[in-house]
């Protein structure tokens, strides 16, 4: 029974992986993201900073923007984001602002907000 519950999540992560492959083929950082609510795909995106010459063209931001337009609301309560790489600080801020309920990521990123904000200790002398 647990495996059946996981199938929708796998479906969405596989779509995010397809988008990441498209980004890689285009010479971009290979990240793909989808925003869903239940079984409805609301938005998707892949990194395209190089092609668009725009620092804001992160997969997560594009997926969030598309979902907001589809719902005619900036509040994405009840939505989930599936992304291939742990979100950076900018994208984490957007996820919080959009009220995304759940984030599922495929790989950790040492540049994510969690890793950047970890307390560091000076080396003993």
Predicted regions and their residues:
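Short secondary-structure boundary segments
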Residues: 107-108
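Single conserved hydrophobic/aromatic residue that forms the stacking wall/gate
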Residues: 114-125
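Short beta-strand scaffold segments in enzyme catalytic cores
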Residues: 31-37
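Immediate flanking context of iron-sulfur cluster ligation sites
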Residues: 73-85
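Short beta->alpha transition motifs characteristic of CBS
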Residues: 42-49
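Local cysteine-cluster metal-coordination motifs and their immediate loop/turn environment
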Residues: 84-98
């Amino acid at each position: 029974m647990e495996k059946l519950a996981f199938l929708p999540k796998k479906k969405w992560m596989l779509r995010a992986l397809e988008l990441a492959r498209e980004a890689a083929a285009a010479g971009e950082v290979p990240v793909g993201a989808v925003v869903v609510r239940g079984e409805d795909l609301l938005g998707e995106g892949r990194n395209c900073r190089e092609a668009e010459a725009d620092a804001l063209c992160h997969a997560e931001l594009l997926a969030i923007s598309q979902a907001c337009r589809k719902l005619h609301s900036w509040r994405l309560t009840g939505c989930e984001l599936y992304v291939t790489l742990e979100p950076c600080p900018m994208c984490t801020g957007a996820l919080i602002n959009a009220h995304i309920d759940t984030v599922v990521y495929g790989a950790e990123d040492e540049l994510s907000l969690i890793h950047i904000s970890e307390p560091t200790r000076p080396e003993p002398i």
